[in-house]
Amino acid sequence: MSNIDKLFASVAQKGHVCVGLDTDVTYLPEALAQQFPNIEDGLFAFNKAIIDSTLDVSACYKVQIAYYEAYGMAGLRAYCRTLAYLREKQAVIIADIKRGDIAKTAEMYAKAHFTGEFEADFITLSPYMGLDSLSPYLPYIKDNGKGVFVLIRTSNEGAKDIEYLPTENGMRVYHVVGEKLQTLGKDYLGECGYSAIGGVMGCTHPDEAAEIRQKLDTTFFLIPGYGAQGGKAEDIAKYLRNGNGGVVNSSRGILLAYRKQENGAANFADCARAEAIRMRDDIRKWL
């Protein structure tokens, strides 16, 4: 089974929540930090507890590599151990690496993150050097069932600086990117009807959601922007099709849910689970 079909099936079974393991050392409850003063062990212990508590209610996990690179080799060892544990648990893994280079460099990125210790099911990519920046990843999609999520329209305030610029034919840049990815993705459709070439589609501008979903009908979405950035569950539903076709990321909202509860630090993993369930149910009620 290809990874896009695995992800589709996981959404159908567990809901749309993508737990973002964007873990900083400062997120660790004090008792856990004292128990694991070593950065590698502390980060992994926290991640493992979050994974164990959310595995049955999370469609997938997104691991942002920068949070681990920031701590040097200790952080990268924690990253590797986290990916290995997710593979052991047969969870769908999105490595949030946002690579965007070309030629041999892109070939090395593809090899690094689709094989070996950094192996993930999906990775995130930036398309702004052109479609040839995606080419080195395509053999892994075709031959190994891997997948990518390419930036289309992001949820940050600065997205308007480039993504919203008009092109010569009046379309915005992100419209052009989305259509090019949809066309490219037709050659990599899973049995579920969605392509292994997915897109990152922020949910903070829902007024265009129905049109986007109609045009990009075979593009599976990784959807940021829920919660703190203003995206609502009722908006997210507009980016889905027949209750599937996208996963919704939450990182700090889940990882730091314990900070909103009295004595939550002692039960940080349970608090994360409760928040993931709340988020899942919030989205489902609008489907």
What is the meaning of each model-derived region?
Residues A70-Y85, I102-E107, M129-K142, T204-R213, ...:
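Active-site-adjacent beta->alpha loops and helix N-cap segments on the catalytic face
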Residues I97, D101-G198:
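Conserved anion-binding
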Residues V19, Y61, D96, I123, ...:
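Conserved, mostly hydrophobic/aromatic
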Residues Q13, S58, T115-D121, K142-V148, ...:
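Glycine-enriched alpha-helix->loop->beta-strand junction motifs that scaffold or abut catalytic
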Residues D22-T26, A66-Y68, K98-I102, Y128, ...:
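Active-site beta-loop-alpha junctions enriched in small/polar residues
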Residues M1-V63, Y68-R81, Y85-I93, G264-L287:
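Conserved N-terminal beta1-alpha1 strand-loop-helix module at the mouth
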Residues C18-D22, K146-S155, V247-S250:
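Non-cysteine beta-strand/loop elements that form the S-adenosyl-L-methionine
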Residues C203-N249, G253-A257:
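A C-terminal functional module that forms or caps the active site or interfaces directly
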